[in-house]
Amino acid sequence: MNTIHATAIIDPGVTLGDKVTIGPYTVIEDDVEIGEGTRIGPHVHIASGARIGSACRIHAGAVLATEPQDLKYAGEKTQLIVGDRTVIRECVTLNRGTKASGRTVVGSDTLVMSYVHAGHDCVIGNHVVIANSVQFGGHCEVGDYAVIGGLTGVHQFVRIGRYSMVGGIARASLDVPPFVMAGGHASFRYEGLNSLGLKRRGFTAEKISMIKDVYRIIFQSGLLLSNALEKVRTDFPAEPEIVEILRFFDSGTHGRKFLRPFNS
């Protein structure tokens, strides 16, 4: 049985799972699907095209799946997809996709804190923590278990790799590879390996040491990036983490540059 406040406005075209709670003055448009056990607070607006998973919590004032802020958008039918058990705090805005990809995605078990904005076609992974007032341009990608500090601006098309941590009040204009820390406002830089985060997630000391050695070659050897990557391919076994790092650097798009070392 669902619990819907008398002042909420729910379009007949909305599909609700069981045990959904909807608070006062919330508006949910047609072509929306909301999974079992999701709780939606007061004054929330969920526009057409939203697909919300099970056991999510959506807090007061959040605005989800509204039209993308893109001059090329011409009314195409697109989506915002949110996974299971994700928490969306107060006044978050998540735009739906454009025809470029058709959807904006936020994964499962992710925490999106207050006043975060994610633009069209962003893909945010699982178990991600996004602190207050982070602002994503369109087409950004965030890997699983990444952490992004508050008040950070993430430029359109920037990719942030898995298990990475971006410091607060940063100007994230460069791609951030997996497993590292990055930060800086005037100059966005590599700040070392996210060793503590990796340890907390069960990475062994040997694995952490190997990843650190890889990034020492990439960022601190003085080699050109292409030569550094070739040295990594030659000197290290094809462990999954090494393959992931190399694939990240090999798959850069839109001319986006990578992080630079902190002493450059």
From Swiss-Prot:
One Gene Ontology cellular component annotation held by this UniProt entry: membrane
Q: List the InterPro entries hit by this protein, alphabetically.
A: Acetyltransf_C (IPR029098), Acetyltransf_C_sf (IPR037157), Hexapep (IPR001451), Lipid_A_LpxA (IPR010137), Trimer_LpxA-like_sf (IPR011004)
Role of this protein: Involved in the biosynthesis of lipid A, a phosphorylated glycolipid that anchors the lipopolysaccharide to the outer membrane of the cell.
Entry's Gene Ontology BP terms: lipid A biosynthetic process
EC supergroup of this enzyme: transferase
Q: Which UniProt keywords apply?
A: Acyltransferase, Cytoplasm, Lipid A biosynthesis, Lipid biosynthesis, Lipid metabolism, Repeat, Transferase
UniProt pathway = Glycolipid biosynthesis; lipid IV(A) biosynthesis; lipid IV(A) from (3R)-3-hydroxytetradecanoyl-[acyl-carrier-protein] and UDP-N-acetyl-alpha-D-glucosamine: step 1/6
Compartments where located: Cytoplasm
Matching Pfam families: Acetyltransf_11, Hexapep
Q: Which family does it belong to?
A: Belongs to the transferase hexapeptide repeat family. LpxA subfamily.
GO terms for MF? acyl-[acyl-carrier-protein]-UDP-N-acetylglucosamine O-acyltransferase activity
Q: Which reaction does it catalyse?
A: a (3R)-hydroxyacyl-[ACP] + UDP-N-acetyl-alpha-D-glucosamine = a UDP-3-O-[(3R)-3-hydroxyacyl]-N-acetyl-alpha-D-glucosamine + holo-[ACP]
Q: Which CDD domains match?
A: LbH_UDP-GlcNAc_AT (cd03351)
Please report the name of this protein according to its UniProt entry.
Acyl-[acyl-carrier-protein]--UDP-N-acetylglucosamine O-acyltransferase
Q: What is the annotated quaternary arrangement, including any partners?
A: Homotrimer.
Q: What is its EC number?
A: 2.3.1.129
